[in-house]
């Protein structure tokens, strides 16, 4: 292609334009107005022609007079032809706008099911958010990104996949976070560390819905979030991303009266620098630096974060590679715990009975987090490879005193989560794929919130597991998957908890573009150190319960995935899933009158069933793109004699998105998410926090306008454009309308 | 978008009719050691508590002042009560609550107002209390 372009250029080079000859020039752009380089423009049936430069311009001179058909062509675009008549000495201009062809899109490859496979072959519901989706929406943290995924609802900082989590006051997570396949829940509260991501170097975020314990063990009770980071490119890449914005002052005078900050715009900003390159023929990697500053939309909700991440890949020999991902995050932030009532929701409330003079609904901390994820992969043969990986997650968290100075670490938390795993992938025959492995992990945490026992300041919870998975393509249309995992957790020196988690999946390709699947799986979650041992009177009266039992789930799902293409006009991808999950022994915080405090207890027997459908539409070669995701939940608490709605779950959840390409390199987009008001919330919280029982539906509209030219992208975003005031979890007002401008410079 | 535009979401509740309890407490006799006087507040309860436990269980039925000054001869307090939707509110048990220890439930009554307080919207009720740490009140349910 390059050679032919060069040949055409050489042929077209004039020695001198003769007066009786004509000249033709013009520009070639795509339908969105972006200049196209390297497009061949030829006069059909002659040797006259040229290729466009970086600005999309072409020039063909010394053309004999006559009538010609001019053809512009490039890979990925529909060739365009125009007829032109050139008179002697004429200098004509002829511009082209090429329409992209619908090239068969590369298969979306996902890895959440423990091995890379095309999305169409994954026999369970799964949603994918790409880096482009994250960047287009100006997102910097995982929780913000998850808000745009169908079937996922954030309850404060807890992830609900199809209603799995509810709200348990930030302790424990029923959703497992994996970074490049390694579990990464925090060592202090077993929570999802939302800011612990190199956001500009992620390739995609995969959300696997439904029990995933057969694949990943405890924590994957309600689903799995897999964040896949990028590899380094062949050519060096540098990106600078600057983003700034502000929260709009709240419109209610009564709220402003209680906090001066609410009368002013509250700024926030982020600066990201990334650089990726090959360092030698065997080594390459990237570095990612982030600075984030957010003054917060609530009093005492400021945060500052500095983060550095790097990923190196070294190929010591053919068929072998070593990958090391490591990151350091320093964070200083106020955690706004609960408001001071609906008359004063911008200030933290207080519970005077706790007795502490600084016992307000906010907790100021400074933390340092370090992660190290090394992995070695070796492929001794064409059909077999193994991966040995390790992980280390260190957290040092110190509370701040009234002057903002960090208190000693002994007053805070020091936590370690570490472990390793071996996984073997073997494809003994076409259509058969076996995965086996073993893992060992441990958490060791010393915290002022966890009283020491027998002189051992560190609370620990080691675990070991073995797992296996067999995939078999029974025929060209039927694919069967079976998996089994055995986990053993040591919760005390003399007590182990063991669990066997099977799963089975069937996939049937009814016809090209239509697959049906059925899935069954067991899930479990061992309560974390925080839930079992937390003792606190400073912020909330809460006492330990070391005897908590694991939560368990049994999940079923049937679903279909379809794809339809109508040439250039339309491309449509859709899913439909019906799911049913029974939960037992869900851990919930309850006020224990005899203990005069809250305590995590095994309480709830629950059933969550429902349906979920998604529809992705791409019209006119990408001129218009839309997404719709709807989830209907029937979530019931079966603990009592009569079924009750399960608390903190919305019955209806709707996510929609629309993106439209405009002339002049502009793209306009909107995202709307709607969640119905929870039918029931936990009233225990409202004993102490005023108006904690107040909820409204969630109705949030985000708007974005992007202007992209060459390597520069400018995005203007309006989040919560309708300035709708709502809560995602009790007693915490979500951000009001805020504006954001993002500049992205890609070299 | 139409759905989202229906209303503006959460808003402050409409203004409520208020009532005010204002008062002064005089301290007689010596003050105990500072470790034994962690905090003092005026509280007005809609019920008669039998124990500390009940204070926590019925926390939302208690109106309370800010923390009072310690080691003074006297101090003033003020409690504003929201009487939205009610013609009158009755506080059966009120007085100065004394936090005597480090634990969250180390509270006891120091001095109790000798009659129920019945407040109507717009009403301002001044009261005077005399406290003596050598002779504190006790919970009605206590021996």
Please place each PLM-identified region on the residue numbering:
Chain A
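Short, acidic, small-residue-rich periplasmic hinge/interaction motif at the N-terminus
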Residues: 29-34, 39-44, 73-77, 87, ...
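Membrane-embedded beta-barrel scaffold of Gram-negative outer-membrane proteins
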Residues: 380-401, 509, 517, 549-603, ...
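Extracytoplasmic beta-strand/coil segments of soluble accessory domains associated
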Residues: 126, 143-186
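Flexible loop and strand-edge segments within Gram-negative outer membrane beta-barrel domains
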Residues: 294-309, 313-315, 319-379, 384, ...
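Outer-membrane beta-barrel translocator/receptor signature
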Residues: 186-188, 201-203, 214-226, 231-308, ...
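Surface-exposed extracellular loop regions of Gram-negative outer-membrane beta-barrel proteins
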Residues: 332, 339-346, 444-446, 490, ...
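Gram-negative outer-membrane beta-barrel transporters
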Residues: 475-480, 573-582, 601-683, 742-744
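Short acidic/polar hinge/loop motifs at secondary-structure boundaries
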Residues: 182-209
């Amino acid at each position: 292609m390059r050679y032919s372009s060069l040949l055409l250029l050489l042929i077209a080079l004039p020695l001198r334009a003769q007066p009786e000859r004509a000249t033709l020039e013009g520009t070639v752009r795509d339908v969105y107005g972006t200049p196209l380089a390297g497009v061949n423009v030829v006069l059909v049936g002659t040797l006259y022609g040229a290729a466009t430069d970086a600005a999309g311009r072409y020039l063909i001179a010394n053309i004999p007079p006559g009538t010609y058909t001019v053809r512009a062509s490039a890979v990925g675009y529909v060739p365009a032809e125009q007829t032109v008549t050139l008179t002697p000495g004429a200098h004509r201009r002829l511009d082209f706008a090429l329409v992209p062809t619908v090239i068969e899109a590369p298969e979306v490859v996902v890895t959440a099911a423990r091995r890379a496979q095309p999305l169409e072959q994954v026999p369970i519901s799964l949603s994918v958010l790409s880096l482009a989706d994250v960047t287009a929406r100006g997102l910097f943290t995982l929780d913000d990104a998850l808000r745009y995924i169908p079937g996922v609802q954030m309850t404060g900082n807890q992830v609900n996949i199809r209603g799995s989590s509810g709200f348990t006051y930030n302790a424990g997570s029923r959703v497992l976070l994996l970074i490049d396949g390694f579990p990464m829940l925090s060592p202090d509260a077993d929570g999802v560390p939302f800011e612990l991501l190199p956001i500009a170097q992620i390739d995609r975020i995969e959300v696997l819905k439904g029990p995933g314990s057969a694949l990943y063990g405890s924590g994957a009770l309600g689903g799995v979030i897999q964040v896949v980071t990028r590899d380094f490119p062949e050519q060096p890449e540098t990106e600078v991303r600057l983003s700034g914005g502000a929260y709009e002052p709240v419109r209610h005078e009564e709220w402003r009266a209680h906090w001066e900050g609410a009368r002013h715009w509250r700024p926030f900003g982020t600066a990201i620098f990334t650089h990726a390159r090959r360092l030698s023929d065997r080594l390459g990697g990237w570095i990612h630096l982030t600075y984030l500053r957010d003054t917060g939309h609530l009093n005492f909700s400021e945060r500052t974060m500095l983060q550095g991440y790097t990923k190196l890949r070294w190929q010591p020999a053919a068929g072998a590679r070593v990958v090391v991902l490591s990151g350091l995050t320093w964070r200083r932030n106020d955690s706004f715990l609960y408001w001071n009532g609906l008359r004063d929701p911008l200030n933290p409330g207080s519970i005077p009975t706790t007795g502490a003079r600084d016992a307000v609904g906010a907790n100021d901390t400074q933390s340092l987090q370090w992660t190290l994820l090394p992995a070695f992969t070796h492929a001794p043969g064409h059909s077999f490879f193994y991966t040995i990986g390790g992980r280390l997650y260190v957290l040092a968290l110190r509370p701040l005193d009234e002057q903002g100075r960090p208190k000693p670490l002994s007053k805070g938390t020091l936590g370690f989560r570490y472990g390793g795993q071996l996984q073997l992938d073997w494809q003994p025959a076409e259509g058969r794929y076996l995965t086996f492995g073993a893992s060992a992990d441990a958490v060791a945490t010393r915290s002022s919130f966890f009283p020491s026992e027998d002189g051992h300041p560190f609370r620990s919870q080691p675990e070991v597991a073995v797992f296996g998975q067999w995939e078999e393509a029974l025929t060209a249309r039927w694919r069967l998957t079976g998996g089994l995992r055995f986990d053993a957790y040591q919760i005390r020196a003399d007590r182990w908890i063991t669990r066997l988690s099977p799963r089975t999946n069937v996939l049937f390709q009814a016809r090209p573009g239509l697959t049906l699947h059925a899935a069954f799986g067991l899930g479990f979650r061992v309560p974390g150190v925080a839930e079992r041992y937390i003792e606190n009177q400073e912020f909330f009266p809460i006492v330990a319960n070391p005897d908590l039992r694991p939560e368990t789930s049994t999940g079923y799902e049937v679903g279909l995935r379809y794809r339809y293409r109508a040439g250039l006009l339309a491309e449509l991808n859709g899913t439909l899933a019906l799911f049913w999950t029974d939960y037992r022994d869900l851990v919930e915080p309850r006020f224990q009158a005899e203990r005069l405090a809250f305590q995590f207890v095994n309480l709830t027997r629950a059933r969550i069933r429902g349906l979920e459908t998604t529809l992705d539409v791409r019209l006119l070669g990408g001129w218009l793109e839309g997404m719709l995701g709807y989830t209907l939940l029937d979530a019931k608490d079966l603990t009592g004699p009569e079924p009750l709605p399960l608390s903190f779950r919305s019955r209806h959840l709707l996510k929609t998105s629309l993106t439209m390409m405009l002339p002049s390199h502009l793209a306009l987009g909107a995202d709307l998410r709607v969640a119905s008001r929870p039918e029931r919330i936990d009233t225990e919280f409202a004993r102490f926090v005023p108006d904690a029982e107040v909820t409204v539906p969630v109705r949030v509209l985000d708007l974005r306008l992007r202007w992209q030219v060459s390597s520069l992208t400018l995005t203007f975003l309006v989040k919560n454009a309708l300035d709708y005031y709502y809560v995602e979890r009790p007693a915490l007002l979500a951000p009001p309308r805020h504006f954001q401008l993002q500049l992205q410079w890609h070299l | 978008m139409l759905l989202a535009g229906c209303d503006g979401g959460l808003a402050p509740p409409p203004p409520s009719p208020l009532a005010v309890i204002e008062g002064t407490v005089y301290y007689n006799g010596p003050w105990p050691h500072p470790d034994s006087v962690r905090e003092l507040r005026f509280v007005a309860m809609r019920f008669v508590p039998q124990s500390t436990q009940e204070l926590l269980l019925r926390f939302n039925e208690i109106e309370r002042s800010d923390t009072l000054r310690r080691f003074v001869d006297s101090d003033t307090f003020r409690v504003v009560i929201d009487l939205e939707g009610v013609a009158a509110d009755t506080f059966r048990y009120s007085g100065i609550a004394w936090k005597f220890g480090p634990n969250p439930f180390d509270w006891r009554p120091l001095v109790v107002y000798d009659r129920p307080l019945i407040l109507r919207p717009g009403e301002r009720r001044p009261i005077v209390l005399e406290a003596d740490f050598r002779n504190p009140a006790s919970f009605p349910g206590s021996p």
